[in-house]
Amino acid sequence: LSDDVVRQSIYRQKCQWTSVKKSLDLVDDEFDLVIRMRTDLEFHDRVPLEACTGNGLYMMNGSYQAGAGREYCDWFYCGPHKRVQEFDPLKVFDDFYADGIRHMHDLVIETLRSLQIPHSVLDLKAWMMDRSKIK
């Protein structure tokens, strides 16, 4: 990839996480569970939200889309409001991308590790919706 393409990709990811952070700042503390997800996901089965009652984050297993070894993804995660707000990739972003582009699942892992956020992975088998179904 050219340096320009790499810079643009990193910039777009930073914009994404800035948008997520700003939207989560709008949520009040009245909710037991806050969900952050892509709006174009399709789920084969019902999401087991009743299993998401702990104090950590519940991350969607990304290996279904990205391949083995990439269990952490940014497509879907949920947890108590406090934990969802704590999960802020912007806190590690600049150092993480200092040497160039890396895969998003590594950013998720680094954020969880650096911020010491308890978490588990949910096997939701979700996939992005066929664009022709979106109106």
Question: Where are the predicted features?
Answer:
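ER/Golgi luminal nucleotide-sugar-dependent glycosyltransferases, focusing on the catalytic module
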Residues: L1-K135
